[in-house]
């Protein structure tokens, strides 16, 4: 779940912040490297460069709670709580020094922050304090006492004495944080209108994907959702969310622009009256654009009490929300539910490479792939406490199996809610990952356990 950040104007150092311990688990000169296996997405990232320090283990402080992070141009500010004190923590660096500006947003008698180091040659000092009676570093912790509202301090962490270039870094940390647009490029990528085949009344339009883009990002698309104004949000496996505009009657003025980035393999977007939600391997985010410039500047943690694994053939798939405001998603072989109080529970298990997600306000569907203990791909109507085959015990029946001639690797499932679909309104469309086709899903709920079928 670590969040890696490039620090300094010229990428002087990198740091990895751990939301599960509210600490920096590594600082190094360099960046990260991904293994080539499965496009680099089935193994964890590795440090590439020379570490200053790494922490193999770190614990969450008592009453600690990670809240998310903010973007101010190149500046990243992590936000969390320890007890009743809300804290903002901004890392920065020069070539020889790692800095943290820590803002204590409310009054407190005493606060203890993690600041563990593994190299005795690295020294900790405080070069700027405001609204704090006493501050010290001891036994891997920063201890501040007599804290006034909106107090702050700047920590200097280095093996060396102060260099002349540090004055610029300190001035940067003391300066006002301003919301700034980071990606000004708007890519015009016209779409293509489809034509009905034969006597069909249905056509398939095409939105062209900007594979050649200024950020050199790989456009492996994973999920999409529509905003109330008709614009779309599209996620990519490497970690971007794109805003797609101009989806109208002729598709001549379709544009793509970067909306958010930095996710760990996002494969789930949900939009409703509560906001824009994104699921990645270790967290559900609630995204905020605070200044209306069509870029996300506040990445709020909605829930992160699940997941965190460094290797897998499969991923984390979602994100379906039922009428009770609960989110449903799949991670590895298990099915999870995050309730409106933002707590997550495993509710079912035994699914194999289960990337298919769908359902309605009243139920949740999951679609595993054929293979071990899964005789053929299937659609499951998930019931709490059930097992669905991969463990080889107590196998519960699916809504339906999908014959191999129809689909060999299921994708998502979509409820048809528009009357423009004519007689298919209220039905479900299944999408094939394996063959790029689609089919109709039928559901009969007249018996004790719903049953279904697929129609190519």
Provide a role label for each language-model segment.
Residues 170-456:
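Beta-propeller domains with acidic blade repeats across secreted/periplasmic ectodomains
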Residues 118-120, 126-184:
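Extended acidic/polar, glycine-enriched regions
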Residues 95-121:
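Surface-exposed beta-strand/loop patches in extracellular or lumenal glycoproteins
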Residues 71-73, 103-111, 147-148, 323:
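A short, structured loop/turn motif at beta-sheet edges
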Residues 64-71, 132-137, 269:
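Short, exposed beta-strand/loop patches in secreted or surface proteins that constitute
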Residues 76-80, 100, 134-146, 276-278, ...:
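Generic recognition of long tandem-repeat/solenoid scaffolds
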Residues 81-83, 103-105, 116, 156-160, ...:
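Solvent-exposed residues in well-ordered beta-strands and their adjoining turns
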Residues 1-99, 116:
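Beta-strand-rich N-terminal accessory domains
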């Amino acid at each position: 779940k670590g969040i890696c950040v490039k620090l300094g104007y010229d990428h002087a150092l990198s740091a990895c912040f751990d939301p599960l311990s509210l600490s920096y688990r590594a600082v190094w000169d360099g960046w990260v490297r991904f293994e080539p296996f499965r496009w680099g997405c089935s193994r964890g990232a590795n440090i590439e460069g020379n570490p200053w320090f790494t922490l193999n283990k770190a614990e969450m402080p008592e009453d600690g709670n990670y809240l998310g992070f903010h973007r101010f141009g190149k500046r990243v500010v992590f936000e969390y709580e320890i007890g009743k004190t809300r804290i903002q923590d901004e890392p920065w660096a020069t070539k020889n020094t790692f800095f943290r500006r820590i803002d204590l947003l409310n009054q407190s008698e005493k606060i203890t922050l993690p600041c563990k180091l593994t190299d005795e040659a690295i020294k900790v000092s405080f070069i700027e304090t405001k609204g704090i009676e006493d501050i010290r570093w001891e036994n891997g912790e920063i201890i501040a006492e007599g804290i006034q509202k909106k107090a702050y301090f700047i920590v200097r962490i280095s093996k060396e004495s102060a260099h002349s270039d540090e004055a610029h870094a300190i001035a940067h940390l003391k300066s006002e944080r301003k919301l700034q647009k980071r990606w000004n490029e708007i890519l015009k990528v016209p779409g293509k209108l489809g034509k009905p085949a034969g006597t069909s009344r249905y056509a398939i339009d095409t939105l062209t994907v900007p594979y050649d883009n200024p950020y050199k990002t790989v456009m492996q698309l994973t999920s999409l959702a529509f905003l109330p104004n008709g614009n779309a949000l599209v996620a990519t496996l490497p970690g971007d969310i794109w805003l797609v505009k101009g989806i109208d009657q002729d598709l001549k003025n379709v544009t793509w622009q970067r909306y958010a980035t930095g996710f760990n393999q996002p494969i789930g977007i949900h939009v409703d009256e509560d906001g824009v939600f994104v699921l990645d391997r270790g967290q559900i985010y609630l995204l905020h654009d605070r200044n209306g410039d069509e870029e996300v500047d506040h990445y709020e943690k909605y829930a992160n009490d699940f997941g965190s694994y460094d290797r897998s053939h499969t991923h984390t798939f979602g994100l379906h929300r039922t009428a009770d405001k609960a989110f449903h998603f799949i991670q590895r072989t298990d099915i999870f539910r995050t309730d409106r109080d933002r707590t997550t529970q495993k509710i079912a298990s035994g699914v194999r490479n289960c990337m298919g997600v769908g359902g309605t306000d009243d139920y949740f569907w999951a679609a595993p792939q054929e293979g071990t203990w899964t005789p053929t791909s299937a659609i499951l109507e998930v019931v709490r406490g059930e097992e669905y085959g991969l463990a080889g015990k107590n196998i519960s029946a699916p809504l339906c199996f999908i014959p191999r001639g129809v689909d060999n690797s299921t994708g998502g499932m979509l409820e048809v809610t528009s009357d423009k679909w004519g007689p298919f309104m209220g039905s479900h469309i299944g999408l094939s990952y394996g063959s790029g086709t689609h089919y109709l899903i039928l559901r009969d709920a007249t018996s004790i356990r719903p049953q279904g079928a697929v129609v190519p």
